[in-house]
Amino acid sequence: MSDRISVVLAEDSLLVRDSVVRALSTDPDVTVVGVAEDYDAAVALVAERSPTIVVTDIRMPPTSTDEGIRLARWMRTAHPHIGVIVLSNYADPGYAAGLLERGTAGRGYLLKERVARFEELHDAVHQVADGGT
């Protein structure tokens, strides 16, 4: 891949945040260009940095409910060219249903337990960067 994939990470858990950044740093095609701990900071970073992809927790402040899905929906309207990967502890496909609708560049849903498998995270990032799901 000739173009680097730029990533904004939105995750409130320090442990998960560090794990994702560490995993992504092992991929020579990927650069993490910003890290946010909540929805508002993520919106500001996306607007400022215009990354290739946003990797976001499904639940984060300020409400700790579905801020990641809210972020993905906002991006679908405001920045439809930016891909989204939502991270979750929940295997329930209902959490991903709204995300996987048409309208965003690439999109994905990845269980947090898979982040430890660097290759799976790398594959997801590359697939979403290429417009896939």
Residue ranges and their predicted role:
Residues 58-62:
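The short loop immediately C-terminal to the conserved phospho-acceptor aspartate in CheY-like receiver
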Residues 1-6:
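Non-catalytic signal-transmission and effector/linker regions of two-component phosphorelay proteins
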Residues 11:
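Conserved acidic carboxylate
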Residues 57, 88:
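Active-site residues of response regulator receiver
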Residues 35-53:
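Acidic, metal-coordinating helix/loop segments flanking the phosphotransfer/catalytic sites
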